Curated annotation (Swiss-Prot):
It comes from Dianthus caryophyllus. The gene is ACO. Keywords: Ethylene biosynthesis, Fruit ripening, Iron, Metal-binding, Oxidoreductase, Vitamin C. Belongs to the iron/ascorbate-dependent oxidoreductase family. One of its GO terms (molecular function) is metal ion binding. Residues 159-259 form the Fe2OG dioxygenase domain. The keyword Oxidoreductase applies. This is Probable 1-aminocyclopropane-1-carboxylate oxidase. Fe cation binds at H183, D185, H240. InterPro entries: DIOX_N, IPNS-like_FE2OG_OXY, IPNS-like_sf, Oxoglu/Fe-dep_dioxygenase_dom, Plant_2OG-oxidoreductases.
Amino acid sequence: MANIVNFPIIDMEKLNNYNGVERSLVLDQIKDACHNWGFFQVVNHSLSHELMDKVERMTKEHYKKFREQKFKDMVQTKGLVSAESQVNDIDWESTFYLRHRPTSNISEVPDLDDQYRKLMKEFAAQIERLSEQLLDLLCENLGLEKAYLKNAFYGANGPTFGTKVSNYPPCPKPDLIKGLRAHTDAGGIILLFQDDKVSGLQLLKDGHWVDVPPMKHSIVVNLGDQLEVITNGKYKSVMHRVIAQTDGNRMSIASFYNPGSDAVIYPAPTLVEKEEEKCRAYPKFVFEDYMNLYLKLKFQEKEPRFEAMKAMETTGPIPTA
């Protein structure tokens, strides 16, 4: 059972308090969450409850209509229902991906009706705006100029932005199969709209797995590996996983605001200068090179990935535009 602790909850509405006191307190809460958790949950954000309710309803309807039977067929074919030992090479999840930037694939994804496509485009646009707002709040806390992180993510065609739509159906053997194995996220900032009734998401904090509590109309935010690099380790990406449940079908809609594939990622010079050693603790690399490595090593510790990128850097320096 996961440790029960006070998970950080950020009230975005208080950022609009122009006397500055509440705003300063909220910025401190975000800073503490980034330093000590790598995760936080935002409420009273810019997405309407009406939009979120509609996205949840249509996503669950879509799963029942188009994906549920395919998932049942898959687990039978893979022999997961009859597994007798730990399963380490597959996850108990049904997923599809929507790409928004640099180009959208929503019109090409099969089995989406027009109303759902239109809805997910609207949802993605609002999540993208919230992602950029949060990145600017991180800049403010770090002493970076506004839009520094957004600009750092921009390649020739802007950032990479997409959404992973997942369902985690009831699992007969949650002790043997994970909903999603432990990993850190490769990219920038991740915004998750998760089920408010069925739990399962956990993060690793101080050596213990901690539940991320379901909360209606909230958005869970976590930091990816690229923010760890750009902040020179001030903020860390954190291992997290999904525990399969025997009851309930958990919905998860995770949107990833990542660097463009050709974006060059490296620690922000002003943050390096603030360090006592004035030392760059992370390498400089092209995001696509990191992703190619990550796809092979996703469910392993992140440190060897950073070391591998350091080795690549020494063999060929990357010019900075």
